[in-house]
UniProtKB/Swiss-Prot annotation:
The gene is tos. This is Exonuclease 1. Its EC number is 3.1.-.-. 5'->3' double-stranded DNA exonuclease which may also contain a cryptic 3'->5' double-stranded DNA exonuclease activity. Also exhibits endonuclease activity against 5'-overhanging flap structures similar to those generated by displacement synthesis when DNA polymerase encounters the 5'-end of a downstream Okazaki fragment. Required for DNA mismatch repair (MMR). Belongs to the XPG/RAD2 endonuclease family. EXO1 subfamily. It comes from the Eukaryota. It comes from Drosophila melanogaster (Fruit fly). Its cofactor is Mg(2+). Residues 1-99 are annotated as: N-domain.
């Protein structure tokens, strides 16, 4: 029954299917397959001639299962035997007769188990058994149709006419009739194997462009079918190889080349085989079926479609001229073999439905107003991670769903916004142009804690918070950032000061961030406390000496005219310059104390002291000027004679490098005079700060040190040129 090995051969074109995947569709069922399975369970009773309905209940299980999945079944039964299958049917009858005789003999011998196997083989499904099932289906409003000849051709037409979207069968011959979707091996769990005609080229191993269904049909006929036996040694594999190799459309010429193409020299292909091959192909194409929509018999495919000679259609059946007889045959009221009338049921009559029986609610194909709804069920697809919501375009809430979808789409971010959020953009750091004119308007520098800076944890500050002094921030371990007064806030707090040096990694705006070295955090505090204690002790001793020796003289203080305001710590440092403390030590310690204690630095507190100091009369100013001149003369007379080394120190002043070149002119003018005055009476021995080492040169033999970039360096100067100090001429 069918083509041997065809279902495994088409494995690449098949897939697993469950009935829930085709919910709401219509299926055509080869009912004789169910009847043969049902008869297998009650073969002993049927062989003995006992009455049973086991096979009926077996078929109804499948019917109820289909109805539970909202699937409309159309049960199709076989009709008359074709002349082409006369030989096949004769062999089947002989086999059943032999099995029946063997079963009776085994029962007489008492070998019951062996007799049962033969009894199953000898049982045949008759039309009377099929009629009992048809009556049960009528009570459930399930359509049944009896084909004029083969049920395979009838089901293929229903599938191609889109009356049924799927076909359920166990006969592999159905694929040769051109069915689109066939379900094999359906069980009571609802699982089956779906074979799709559009994927058959995968089973043949050719591309879709070179594939045609006629090639598949011819391959199956060559391998052997119900209408034609195969040639010796020819199966599906060799038949497929030959069909793919030949390009001849006329099979009468191509079949003669089989021995040479398949390298089978002993194989003979006679004219009788070629004639039977053409008849078998015409039978699969042009078999008669019954059209329930038009209530008439017709061919599966018209002869004009393939330009087939009618003489090859002798095995495809004959047309019944009486349309009324053809209708009752299709309804199951006639015996297809004897044409004896068995029932008089018509679709217009209502069939009584027993209680507790599930009735189908689908429209019958026998109704005159029946039309194919063309409701295609979507095919089973691979599971997808995305969830697609089904939109009902016929419902009343169509506009609401569209508006909701539009709101969701508008709320989503655009592609450009997403790229802007997740893409890394390296920003260029551009050095501002050097402008000679100071009066030209400059845009204020951006905030140093802007999001684009390298510090991702900094927070933006408002206008009020920006005016306040920010706490000390340890940015790196550079000694230059610790000792350079240029890193403090600008002198006058001017807005619009532009940073020029592009080599620095971070640019800080005025009064926003102070830089403090982490390296000298602990050592600087200890050094500052020691120096403060020494200065206090020396200050007390010197006060006692001055009170005893110079009781008549007034205590004089050096006041830098360019820097009128100083904090108390800076005043104490400047008053004790002559006691051995260097200007560099005093400046560094004062800066450190101002940063640690939160006291403004001397340069920063200049503007505040100028505003807070009361106005002194002109006469007082003259007296103070005279006192300063006299005190300077006394100090110059008491000071030792300067050496060549000290002269060079007097002519030079320590200038600190900074990133802020715009404010360097103002700072240099404010500190040049005071630096020059302090350098005039600096002692030869100086205290070293930071990483500097004491000089190893012998006393009395001064040796000038040179620097490749900064030139000659004074011996008395600290070794801080590596951190940004250099010697420059004092601005006059």
């Amino acid at each position: 029954m069918g083509i041997t090995g065809l279902i495994p051969f088409v494995g690449k074109a098949s897939s697993q299917l469950h009935l829930k995947d085709i919910r709401g569709s219509t299926v055509a069922v080869d009912t004789y397959c169910w009847l043969h399975k049902g008869v297998f369970g009650c073969a002993e009773k049927l062989a003995r001639g006992e009455d049973t309905d086991v096979y009926i209940q077996y078929c109804l299980k499948y019917v109820n299962m289909l109805l539970s999945y909202d699937i409309k079944p159309i049960l199709v039964f076989d009709g008359q035997h074709l002349p082409a299958k006369a030989l096949t049917e004769k062999r089947r009858r002989d086999s059943r007769k032999q099995s029946k005789e063997r079963a009776a003999e085994l029962l007489r011998l008492g070998r019951i188990e062996e007799a049962r196997s033969h009894m199953r083989r000898c049982v045949d499904v008759t039309h009377d058994m099929a009629l009992r099932l048809i009556r049960e289906c009528r009570s459930r409003n399930v359509d049944c149709i009896v084909a004029p000849y083969e049920a395979d051709a009838q089901m293929a037409w229903l599938n191609r006419a889109d009356v049924a979207q799927y076909i359920i069968t166990e006969d592999s011959d159905l694929t040769l009739f051109g069915a689109k979707n066939i379900i094999f091996k359906l069980d009571l769990n609802g699982s089956g194997l779906l074979v799709e005609a559009e994927k058959l080229h995968l089973a043949m191993g050719c591309t879709e462009e070179k594939y045609h269904f006629d090639k598949f049909r011819r391959m199956c006929i060559l391998s052997g079918c119900d209408y034609l036996d195969s040639l010796p040694g020819i199966g599906l594999a060799k038949a497929c190889k030959f069909i793919l190799k030949t390009e001849q459309e006329d099979m009468r010429i191509a079949l003669k080349k089989i021995p040479s193409y398949l390298n089978m020299r002993n194989l003979e292909v006679d004219d009788d085989y070629i004639e039977n091959f053409m008849k078998a192909e015409a039978t699969f194409r042009h078999m008669f079926i019954y059209n329930p929509l038009e209530r008439r018999m017709q061919r599966l495919c018209a002869l004009e479609d393939y330009e087939t000679d009618e003489r090859y259609c002798s095995n495809a059946g004959t047309l019944l001229e009486d349309s009324e007889q053809a209708l009752h045959l299709a309804l199951g009221n006639l015996n297809p073999f004897s044409m004896k009338r068995l029932d008089s049921w018509t679709p217009e009559k209502a069939w009584p439905t027993p209680k507790n029986v599930k009735r189908s609610k689908h429209k019958s194909i026998w109704q005159t107003n029946f039309q194919s709804e063309n409701t295609h069920t979507p095919k089973k697809e691979n599971p997808c991670a995305l969830f697609f919501k089904k939109v009902d375009f016929v419902g009343k809430t169509l506009n609401e769903e569209i508006e909701a979808n539009q709101r969701l789409e508008q709320a989503k971010q655009t592609e450009a916004e997403l790229f802007n959020m997740y893409s890394f953009k390296a920003k260029r750091r551009r050095s501002p142009s050097r402008e000679d004119s100071v009066d030209q308007e400059r845009t204020p520098p951006p905030s140093p804690v802007h999001k684009s800076r390298h510090n991702p944890f900094a927070k933006e500050r408002t206008g009020e918070e920006a005016n306040q002094r920010s706490p000390v921030v340890c940015e790196n371990a550079s000694l230059l950032r610790l000792l350079s007064p240029k890193k403090a806030s600008p002198l006058d707090g001017e807005a619009g000061v532009k940073k020029v040096d592009s080599l620095k990694r971070s640019i800080f705006a005025k009064e926003q961030v102070q830089i403090r070295s982490r390296f000298f955090a602990t050592q600087d505090e200890q050094t500052r406390l020691q120096r403060e204690h020494l200065r206090d002790t020396e200050n007390d001793d010197m006060d006692e000496q001055k009170l005893s020796s110079h009781s008549g003289h007034k205590k004089l203080r050096l006041v830098c005219k360019d820097i009128p305001g100083k904090n108390p710590i800076r005043q104490r440092c400047s008053s004790q310059i002559s006691d051995g403390e260097t200007d560099t030590d005093t400046t560094a310690s004062s800066l450190l104390e101002s940063q640690d204690k939160g006291v403004p630095s001397p340069l920063e507190s200049q503007e505040d002291l100028n505003n807070s100091q009361p106005q002194i009369p002109t006469e007082g100013n003259t007296n103070s000027t005279t006192i300063r001149i006299k005190s300077l003369d006394l100090l110059l007379e008491n000071s030792p004679e300067p050496t060549q080394e000290s002269d060079r120190n007097n002519n030079d002043a320590i200038i600190l490098l900074s990133d802020d070149s715009c404010s360097s002119d103002q700072r240099a003018s404010s500190t040049s005079s005071s630096s020059q005055q302090r350098q005039n009476f600096l002692p030869t021995s100086k205290r070293r700060v930071g990483l500097s080492k004491p000089s190893t040169a012998k006393k009395g033999t001064p040796k000038s040190r040179t620097n490749g970039k900064l030139g000659a360096v004074s011996q008395n100067q600290t070794k801080l040129s590596m951190f940004g100090f250099q010697t420059k001429p004092v601005l006059k």
